[in-house]
Amino acid sequence: MKLTKVLFFMNMLSGMGYSIFSPLFPALAIKKRIAETIIGVIISVFDLANTIITAFAPLLFIKFTRIKLLYISTFSEATCTILYGLIGNYFNSYYSLIIFMIFFRIIHGISNGIIATLVYSLTISLAKESEQKSALGNLEIGWCIGLALGPIIASIFYKIGGYLLPFLFLGSILYISVYLSSNVAQEKTESNNLEQGNPPILKFLSHLDILVILLAFFFGMISESFFYPSLTNHLEKYFNLSLSVASLFFMILAIAYIITLLNIDKATERLGLYGSIFIGLLIAAFGVLMVYPYPPFPKSIIFVIIGLTMIGGGSAPIFIPGLVNLSKNIKKIDPNIDEFSSNDISSAINNITIAIGDFCGPIIGGYFSTHFGFKSSCLIVSTFIFIYSILYFIYFRSHIFVKEKNIHFDFDSKSEERELMNYPGLYKENNIEIDINLDGIGKRKRSFNPKLKYNEEDDCHYLKLSEN
């Protein structure tokens, strides 16, 4: 099997394992009188473990081979999924249930962090630069198909056999990932750098451009994860939906994400990488507000669907352009870094930030829902995301868009295309208008007002000159 297909299916299965927990466990925990704040902690420790292991992933890749880590992680992820069902079904002690769930959520988080870092790093490394956005988009589609299938499996098998059956079924399916790992082991890559080590992550985190993008990842993930402890209960309580039906609402995020991913190239072409992130943040902020809308909008299941669709659709323009931006910034910071190491680092930083957002989201959502109610928690989270989207826009407006500059070129005709290269830091964004004075020998000085179009694949600007 082609390696890109193997990575796609591994990511899809990992998404299924991740998404089945949030619809089912909170409902079980509430029946066993576990507070929403504690439920949020149990959900979030997965991402805390994911964050820590991802931070050390480049060091682990030096000490252990990537392939061995992949074998262990895929086996562990499948086993933890089965154990969630067994523990939830047979452990009636309040403290035993919490302790064992937290322990295996940590193990699952560690496994998922290693799988995600390797899968994304290999995908972006094996793709040509012009195809990286599409390759990452396809990989994300695999993850989102998994996120959508998880709640469907939860809904169908919960109706058939209660809480335990969905976890037993999905855990058995996830053992397919162990087989897929053997395909990765057999595949030879052109660079033969699968077992090469990486430079430390920390030196890249001191750069403000990278930190600003990572904060966008963080708030994007908060928008998706803050209602994990509360949404199922909210839908059951206020709209009288059964657990099997309420579980399906988690799939709306994934479907909206997939649809947006299919059009991500068009979006980034029109808005640019930085503009796409800004628009994604705005859409996510208003989507969170719509999940429990304030007047004049009525409280309606239609608005819940619209809100979840906006959150899922807004996430894609944040994560995919952001990851491409990360990889480019890392190469600029360290021009000597090799392709695999650069993508290991960008993948690790991306996964760390998303895991931190996924860790904080359920805790924030559980706390606010417990103390202020679900309605207020939506308003608070939406406000924070909106404020950051404005700060993000101000920062990149001042750093990316370039003021007028004079550049001298010779020209042969009144209207022609010219390629501007080797001007580091001069042009950074789409459709910047500048005045260019062209001084030709034996020709009179003339002023032109060109339109610049930045070609991200070639990392240069193409210029159409027309005489004023």
What are these regions (language model features)?
Residues F104-G142:
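Cytoplasmic helix-loop-helix junction between adjacent transmembrane helices
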Residues I52-N89:
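Conserved MFS/SLC helix-loop-helix module at the cytosolic interface between two early adjacent transmembrane helices
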Residues D47-A55, L147-A148, A254-I258, L262, ...:
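Residue-level signature of mid-helix packing/kink "hotspots" within the transmembrane helices
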Residues N138-S182:
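Helix-loop-helix hairpin linking two adjacent transmembrane segments in secondary transporters
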Residues I114-A127, P317-P335:
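Intracellular juxtamembrane helix-capping segments at the cytosolic ends
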Residues S76-Y94, I283-P298:
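C-terminal ends and interior cores of transmembrane alpha-helices
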Residues F21-P23, V212-F250:
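Extracytoplasmic gate region of multi-pass secondary transporters
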